[in-house]
Amino acid sequence: MEDIPTMVKVDRGESQILSCRGRRCGLKVLGYVTGDMKEFANWLKDKPVVLQFMDWILRGISQVVFVSNPISGILILAGLLVQNPWWALCGCVGTVVSTLTALLLSQDRSAIAAGLQGYNATLVGILMAVFSDKGDYFWWLIFPVSAMSMTCPVFSSALSSLFSKWDLPVFTLPFNMALSLYLSATGHYNTFFPSKLFMPVSSVPNITWSELSALELLKSLPVGVGQIYGCDNPWTGAIFLCAILLSSPLMCLHAAIGSLLGVIAGLSLAAPFKDIYSGLWGFNSSLACIAIGGMFMALTWQTHLLALACALFTAYFGACMTHLMAAVHLPACTWSFCLATLLFLLLTTENPNIYRMPLSKVTYSEENRIFYLQNKKRVVDSPL
C-alpha cells in the first residue's frame, strides 16, 4: 500500500518531462516554418536546382510585404487565386521571368535566393492584368508582362548601385517605373493592349456622413493590406495578413495598424467612401508602417511612433500622388510609399533608440530587434 503514492509521483514526473519535451519539440518545429526559414534555405543548397528555384519564386511573391518565407509565399499565392486566378498567373509569370533574367545578368545569388529579384515583377504582372481593359485571360498580355518583368532586375541593379551610397533599399521603385512606362506607352486607346482610363477628379464628391458603414470600415482593414497586391477581396487580405503573421507577428501588427491609419487619413480628408472601403487609402500606409516599424529600423517605442507618423504621412502623400498622376492618366501605384519611407529612413538623429538597420543585416522585425539589442549591449560593454 505504501508503494502506490510513490508510483503516482513517478508517473507525474514522467508526464511533466514528456509535456516539456513536447512543448520544446513544438516550438522547434514552429521555429523552422516562421521567420525567414533560414534552415530550410540552407537545407536546399545541395538539392536539385528546380526545388531551389521554386523556393526563390515563392520568396519573391512574399517579398512584396518584406517577407522571405516560402510558406508565406504559398499562402499569398492562395489569396491571389481566391481573388482572381488570372492575376495570380500573371504575377507568377512576372516573378519567374524576372528571376531568370537576374540569373542571366549574374546578379547576387543570395539576393535572388531571398526573392529580392522577383517581388517587383510580381507586382508588375498582377497590376498589368488588373489595369488591362481587355479583361481576364487575354493571353497576349503574357508577352508585355514578360517584357516589362525583364526590366525589373535592370532597374533594381541600377537603383541599388545608386542607393548603396546611403545603404537604402530600392523598395518597389522598379515596379513603379516599369508599370508607369508600360501604361504611358500604351494607354487607354491602344489597339493591342488598352489599359483602364485614369481621370483626375472633376467634381466635388457627394459625401453623406450618415451613410458611413462601420462594417465596411472594418472590412477595409484587411482590404487595405490586400491592395498591396491590387486585391479588393477582404478574404484575400485576411489570407495575406496570415501569411505575414506566420513570418513575423510584429510585421503583421504594423501592417494592420498602417491600414487603419490610412482609413483614418481618408476620413479626415472626406475621401469618397468607396475609395476607403476598397482599401485604396490603406495599402501604401500599411507598407510604410511595416518598413519603419521594425523592418528597416529596429523596433523600439520611439521607432514605433515614427512608423505611425510615417504611415499617416504616406497616406496623405498618396492622395497628393493620386491627383498628380491622374493628371497624366496614370495610377499612383506605390510611389508615395517609396518616396515617403525613403525620406524617413534618411532622417538623422542623435537618439540611439532610433536605429536604422544595416541593409545587409535586415531579416524580419523580431530578429532585427535582437540584432539591435546585441549591438547596443556590445557598445555598453566595450571599453572606452
Curated annotation (Swiss-Prot):
GO biological process terms held by the UniProt record: establishment of localization in cell; urea transmembrane transport; urea transport; water transport
Tissue: Expressed in brain, spleen, kidney, testis and lung, with highest levels in brain.
Pfam families: UT (PF03253)
Protein family according to the UniProt entry: Belongs to the urea transporter family.
Gene: Slc14a1
Name of the protein in its database record: Urea transporter 1
Record organism: Rattus norvegicus
Top-rank lineage group of the source organism: Eukaryota
Function: Mediates the transport of urea driven by a concentration gradient across the cell membrane. Mediates the transport of urea across the cell membranes of erythrocytes and the renal inner medullary collecting duct which is critical to the urinary concentrating mechanism. Facilitates water transport in erythrocytes.
Subcellular location: Cell membrane; Basolateral cell membrane
Lineage: Eukaryota, Metazoa, Chordata, Craniata, Vertebrata
Membrane topology field: Multi-pass membrane protein
Predominant place of localization: membrane
Keyword vocabulary terms for this entry: Cell membrane, Glycoprotein, Membrane, Transmembrane, Transmembrane helix, Transport
Residues annotated as site: Important for channel permeability: T334
GO cellular component: basolateral plasma membrane; plasma membrane
Transmembrane parts of this sequence: 61-81, 85-105, 111-131, 138-158, 168-188, 250-270, 279-299, 305-325, 327-347
Catalytic activity: urea(in) = urea(out)
Glycosylated residues (UniProt): N206
Subunit architecture: Homotrimer; each subunit contains a pore through which urea permeates. Identified in a complex with STOM.
GO MF terms held by the record: urea channel activity; urea transmembrane transporter activity; water transmembrane transporter activity
Record's keyword annotation contains Cytoplasm: no
Keyword Membrane in record: yes
